[in-house]
Structures are given as C-alpha cells and as structure tokens.
Swiss-Prot record:
InterPro entries: HTH_IS21_transposase_type, Integrase_cat-core, Resolvase_HTH_dom, RNaseH-like_sf, RNaseH_sf. Involved in the transposition of the insertion sequence. Belongs to the transposase IS21/IS408/IS1162 family. Keywords: DNA recombination, DNA-binding, Transposable element, Transposition. The keyword Flavoprotein does not apply. PANTHER family: TRANSPOSASE (PTHR35004:SF6), TRANSPOSASE RV3428C-RELATED (PTHR35004). This is Putative transposase for insertion sequence element IS5376. Residues 113-287 form the Integrase catalytic domain. GO terms for biological process: DNA integration; transposition. Residues 5-67 form the HTH IS21-type domain. The keyword Lyase does not apply. It comes from the Bacteria. It comes from Geobacillus stearothermophilus. Residues 20-39 bind DNA.
C-alpha cells in the first residue's frame, strides 16, 4: 500500500504530463497501483474501520496545499499558521500527518533529472566580481562544467565570458574529462543562442560550428526551470564556499593552479551527497566520445581592408603588409594569449608572437614611404644660356 504522500505525488506527476510508466519508475511502485490511484478521489487508508474525526481534519486541505504546491515542510511554521486559523490541537498530530509527505518530498518532490554515463554535461558562469591583480582591477568570472552522471567537476577562472573564452573553457573541460559528452546543457547565453523565434531556439552560427566540430548536441534550459541545471549550480556554490573564499593569489595563473589542485585532491574525491560515490570513481564509467586530433580555433576573428601602401588598422595601431595585398581584404585572428596571425584566402601570410618584441608598424610605414619617395628621380630639363645684354635689349624694346 502506498503512503498518502505518494498518492498526492502520483496526482501531481500525472497532472504534469508524466506517463504511468514514468511515474511508477520514479516512485518505485507497480504500474497497476499508479493507474488505480490516478483515478481514485481519495488517498489510501490503513484501516477500513471508521476513523474518529481529528481536530486537524478541517486544516488538511490547507496543509496539503502548503506542502505540495508551496514546498513548505517546516512544522513550526505550519503549526503557527493553522493556529492563526483556529486550530486548537497539538503539534504531535500535525507532525505525524506531515511525515509521509515530507519523506516523499525528500525522495522526489521535484523529479530529479538523472543522466546515463556520457549523456550530458552542464555548464554555467559565475560573476565573481572585481579583483586587483598586479596592480590592475579586473572583472573575474568562474566557469564550471559538471558531468551529469559522475558529477565530475572542472572549473577555471577567466577575465571574460565572451564566446571565445566560453569555447576555450569547453575545450579545456573536454580535455580534463578525457572526452566529449553527447549533450551539453547551457543557460540561455547570448554567446550560444541568438534568442528564440516562436519558442524555437535560434543557435548562434559560430557556436553551432563549434558544437558540430566536437560532435555534441547543445541544449538550453527551458525558461523558469531552475532545476534543469541544478548540478552545475550546486558545484558553483560548492567551489565558491569551499575553495575561493579565503584563498590568496597574486595572478590568475596562480589562482587556477590552486583551483585545479583542489579539484583533483578534494572536490572530485569527496563522495557525492546523492550518489554516495566520489565523482572520480563514477567518472571511470562515463562513456565519452573521443576528442578530435586538433583543437577548434577559438581566436577572435576580424576582417580588414588593406590600403594602397599595404597598411591597415587593427586595435588603433597601423600594420604593414607587402604591396601585393593592397586593396585586398585579409582576416586577422587573435588568440586568447594575444598572438596574432593574418590570413588571405585561407593562407597564413604573417604571424606576430605576443612574447616577442614587435617593431612599430607605424615606423615601418614611414620608412617605406620615405624609400618610395627617394626612388622618384627629379625631372631633367635643359635650358639655353644667353648673355645678359640680350635681356637688356629685350627690355628696351630692341629686337635682335
């Protein structure tokens, strides 16, 4: 026989559109029992004997609403509320009535989304706030990825949440986990989607190419469904509370080194509250797809028109190419580490490493223009020479 709490859970799940088989599977009871109580107007009774009326009876509909619809299971709070409505009974009868509802709610009040090995990864950002690093104020963000089955966590601090950093963080998470899941669940990020059209998600073009390259299906949370990516949200809170608070660091590199060491030695070794098993143990069961041989290029992309003298402007600076590219359009690719590569029709034509000292391109342009001016020869003109007496005669009106 099912409990009264399970009876109301069956009703609620059925109203939400779940099938009889799914309800039976979630609650661990027989399908015939589910079918029976779906159409039953009353909860099951332990005894067919006529029960005495309870002082709590008039307040049970209110209590059911508060527990099942509002999620309130604090007996002290509910006791106070029904006392305000005229209840004269004690607390014990209230607690006994609430017990089956509370137990069922703990088991499955909101249906937990459990995934199969390798099926899903959840990702999200956390805006940490402004920090001072090497004398400069920067906005710090935390990226977190969690595998749905094992709860294995990867995280990294960055100074940007733009699309290029998001893709790079995803690549590093795939490498950390040793493969790619079938699906990756996102919040409704502007770096992933271009919004919705008549309820249908419009995927960002470059991000769609990225997802296809790694072979995963991108998914976004349904609006107002906070539980959908609860695993990664809990992971974010766990990292902030147990790692970030009180951690001293002088650079982002040092902060991430400490974070990754903590993930390896603490966070991913601690048994999960739901599974009872550490993420590292369950991680061995994840069936992830292999990574491609080459990383996707997450560089910033920018097209530039080359001027007649081979120069073009990028980020407020003048750059110089050979004259053969004059009037042509080139592609500038800037990696997240600052390295810059120039391309024309898919072929690399120049590479500037941020780690090396770069000669001022403005100086190169000035030098080239000077050289070009020096190659222009002055026009040679032959002039006849005459004695000055000829010009004097001309002024007096005399002709020769």
């Amino acid at each position: 026989m099912i409990t009264r709490g399970e009876f109301f859970m069956i009703k609620e799940m059925y109203e939400r559109g779940m099938s009889i088989s799914d309800i039976a599977r979630e609650l661990g009871i027989d399908r015939k029992t589910v079918r029976k109580y779906i159409h039953s107007p009353n909860p099951p009774s332990k005894s067919k004997r006529k029960q005495r009326k309870s002082k709590l009876d008039p307040f049970k509909p209110y209590l059911q609403k508060r527990m099942l619809e509002d999620g309130v299971f604090n007996s002290e709070k509910l006791f106070f509320e029904i006392r305000q409505q005229g209840y004269t009974g004690g607390k014990t009868i209230l607690k006994d009535y609430m017990k089956p509802f509370r137990e069922t709610a703990k088991k499955k009040y909101t249906v937990r989304y459990e995934t199969l090995p390798g099926e899903q990864m959840q990702v999200d950002w956390k805006e940490v706030g402004e920090v001072v690093i090497e004398g400069k104020k920067v906005k710090l963000s935390l990226f977190v990825a969690t595998l749905g089955y094992s709860r294995m966590k990867y995280a990294v601090f960055t100074t940007s949440q733009d699309q290029e950093h998001l893709m790079e963080c995803l690549i590093q998470s795939f490498k950390y986990f040793g493969g790619v899941p079938k699906k990756v669940l996102f919040d409704n990020m502007k770096t992933v989607t271009d919004g919705r059209e008549q309820g249908v998600v419009k995927w960002n073009q470059r991000f769609s190419e990225f997802a296809s390259y790694y072979g995963f299906i991108p998914k976004v949370c349904r609006p107002y469904r906070a539980q959908t990516k609860g695993k990664v949200e809990r992971a974010i809170q766990y990292i902030m509370d147990h790692f970030y608070v009180g951690t001293a660091f002088e650079s982002i590199e040092e902060l991430n080194f400490l974070l990754h060491r903590w993930l390896d030695q603490v966070a991913n070794r601690k048994p999960n509250a739901t599974t009872g098993i550490s993420p590292q143990e369950r991680w061995a069961e994840e069936s992830l797809k292999p990574l491609p041989l080459k990383d996707y290029d997450t560089s910033y992309l920018s097209y530039r028109k080359v001027h007649w003298d081979g120069s073009f402007s990028y980020k407020g600076e003048q750059w110089l190419l050979s004259a053969e590219y004059a009037g042509k359009e080139i592609l500038v690719k800037e990696r997240l580490n600052g390295d810059i590569r120039l391309y024309f029709r898919g072929e690399e034509i120049s590479h500037v490493d941020q780690q090396k000292k770069v000669i001022s391109f403005a100086e190169k342009i000035k030098k080239k223009q000077t050289e070009m001016a020096a190659t222009i020869s002055p026009v040679s003109v032959e002039v006849d020479t005459r004695p000055l007496s000829v010009y004097d005669a001309f002024l007096r009106g005399e002709s020769s």
